[in-house]
Design a protein with these regions (language model features):
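Glycine-rich, proline-tolerant flexible connector loops at the mouths of alpha/beta enzymes
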Residues: 33-53, 98-116, 138, 172-185
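Hydrophobic faces of well-ordered beta-strands that scaffold small-molecule active sites
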Residues: 2-14, 44-46, 65-72, 98-100, ...
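Conserved N-terminal beta1-alpha1 strand-loop-helix module at the mouth
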Residues: 1-80, 92, 153
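Glycine-rich phosphate-binding active-site loops on the catalytic face of alpha/beta enzymes
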Residues: 11, 69-70, 80, 92-107, ...
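Glycine-rich anion/phosphate-binding loops
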Residues: 74-89, 109-118
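Short, flexible/disordered intra-domain loops and linkers
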Residues: 18-23, 180-188
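Alpha-helix-loop-beta-strand connector modules within alpha/beta enzyme cores
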Residues: 48-72, 112-134, 141, 148-160, ...
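Catalytic cores of alpha/beta
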Residues: 78-92, 142-153, 196-204, 212-228
Length: 248
């Protein structure tokens, strides 16, 4: 197993969030793209305004690194029309994979139809362009029962509308990494929520994201069913893997 092929190397902060200039933020994105090429990561996950720049860097290198972006991030409560428009723009710019934030607040209020419609139409859009769709459920905002229900919901939408052959093209993703929790409760992927998602969303793919910062945690997430790891600590994970391999 080559752990680099599980990694969605991620940088999603805006310049304002990072407290730096737009130029400095762009430099961070460019550095991540070059790192992804050097370490053979699966994907670079960035804001859509950087897709063109990163795509050019990857293309010139000849690397197989994919480019992903987030849609309706981080709250997921925009209208369906806005979600679709944002996704269409990202596809046009050249994104290979789109990570949609599900309208989890609507789901929590019992508005299942809202989630069903947006997930169905977003999958249809992605599949029509041969793109991968990932749905961020924001597990930290949900109870265990809600995690089970929404994971099963996405699974059933795929199997009933798009067939099991497309299960490999749709992910359920744990977290944005931006959700604010109380009392230092983890806001990202935990072993418990990845187990729940995996048990209830398979044969769909699973992405563990938020708080996965070391090699051991990444390995554990993979053993629990994660097919992809979203992390801003890809280099640290890779370096530890290389160190571990040299120890044998």
């Amino acid at each position: 197993m080559k752990i680099s092929h599980y990694l969605d190397a991620t940088y999603l902060k805006t310049a304002i969030q990072a407290g730096i200039t737009e130029k400095e933020n762009l430099e961070k994105v460019v550095a991540l793209a070059k790192e992804a090429i050097s370490y053979d990561y699966k994907l670079v996950m960035i804001r859509s305004n950087y897709i063109t720049t990163v795509k050019k860097i990857v293309s010139i290198s000849g690397a197989k690194v994919l480019i992903g972006t987030v849609i309706d991030f981080p709250c997921g409560d925009s209208s369906l029309k806005q979600k679709i428009q944002e996704a269409e723009k990202a596809i046009k710019l050249g994104a290979d994979e789109l990570d949609f934030v599900v309208n989890y607040n609507a789901f929590k209020k019992g508005n299942i139809d809202v989630v069903t419609e947006e997930v169905t139409l977003c999958i249809a859009l992605c599949l029509s362009h041969q793109k991968i769709a990932k749905f961020i459920i924001e597990a930290a905002a949900l109870s265990n029962e809600e995690i089970i229900v929404i994971s099963q919901l996405v699974k059933h939408i795929v199997l009933e509308n798009f067939g099991e052959e497309n299960a490999k093209n749709v992910f359920v993703k744990s977290s944005t990494g931006f959700f604010k929790t109380e009392r230092e409760i983890p806001n990202g992927a935990t072993f418990e929520n990845i187990m729940l998602i995996s048990k209830n969303a398979k044969p769909l793919k699973i992405k563990a994201a938020g708080g996965v910062r070391d090699y051991e945690t990444a390995l554990k997430m993979i053993s629990l069913g994660a097919d992809r790891i979203g992390t801003s600590s890809s280099k640290e994970i890779i370096n530890k893997e290389q160190h571990s391999n040299q120890s044998y």
